[in-house]
Amino acid sequence: MPNDNRLAPAALAAQAAALPAAWRHVLEQPAVARAFASVLGHVEQRLAEGAVVYPATPFRALDQLAPADVRVVILGQDPYHGPGQAQGLAFSVPDDCKCPPSLRNIFNEIAVDYPRPTRHDLSAWTRQGVLLLNTSLTVEDGQPGSHAKRGWETVTDALIAEVARDPSPKVFLLWGAHAQAKQALVPADAGHLVLAANHPSPLSARRPPVPFVGCGHFRQTNAWLQQRGQKPVDWSGEQNNASRQGKFAL
């Protein structure tokens, strides 16, 4: 039986209100507040009409990190649209879910330089300052992209810009054209590192201009962080996952 990751009525507004102050400040900006109100109205209407919306915790990527805590940003597009998959963290699924193809390619790339991750739940990355943010935070069952163009992009663009404004050094991993379009939100003089490649989907991972396969982004990220006196990310995920599992339960 899949994990019940369905969004409950009124949960989206409650979770937004419970976000850390630094993120709530972004949501309170006038243009962002209007966009979020539009999203919220649409989501609640669809739930009232009987639609199944995922995930149960749309803002989970923000729950554990303030902007100043973020060291790496990985952008996804919208949540997985099957039952029991989406967790509120881009690319991540529960450990008992079959590994999605894009995540499998991510693990393959990590395994070039580090031990291959054994868990599909990427919570350990979040504990180390990796923001796993989709640009649309909700989706309807079996309908990819169903909540795109509803206002989420305005909300998540503002969140990305807030992270980029923070002066602590960060790496932005932009995979695919959708993520790369967000590079404009990262000022060139901000002192951050931007690495771009194709999306890890099997449809594009080996294609030019910059194949995801062989991109070396995980190694490059750690080298850059270490040059700035920061700890490398344990991409294998083992050091934090086991002891923190309960905290990240859906």
Curated annotation (Swiss-Prot):
Its main location: cytoplasm. Its EC number is 3.2.2.27. Residues 228-250 are annotated as: Disordered. It catalyses: Hydrolyzes single-stranded DNA or mismatched double-stranded DNA and polynucleotides, releasing free uracil. Coiled coil: none annotated. It is an enzyme of class 3 (hydrolase). It holds the Pfam family UDG. One of its GO terms (biological process) is base-excision repair, AP site formation via deaminated base removal. GO terms for molecular function: uracil DNA N-glycosylase activity. GO terms for cellular component: cytoplasm. InterPro entries: UDG_fam1 (IPR002043), Ura-DNA_Glyclase_AS (IPR018085), Uracil-DNA_glycosylase-like (IPR005122), Uracil-DNA_glycosylase-like_sf (IPR036895). SUPFAM superfamilies: Uracil-DNA glycosylase-like. The keyword NAD does not apply. The active site is at 78 (proton acceptor). It is found in: Cytoplasm. NCBIfam families: PRK05254.1-1 (NF003588), PRK05254.1-2 (NF003589), PRK05254.1-4 (NF003591), PRK05254.1-5 (NF003592), ung (TIGR00628). Excises uracil residues from the DNA which can arise as a result of misincorporation of dUMP residues by DNA polymerase or due to deamination of cytosine. This is Uracil-DNA glycosylase.
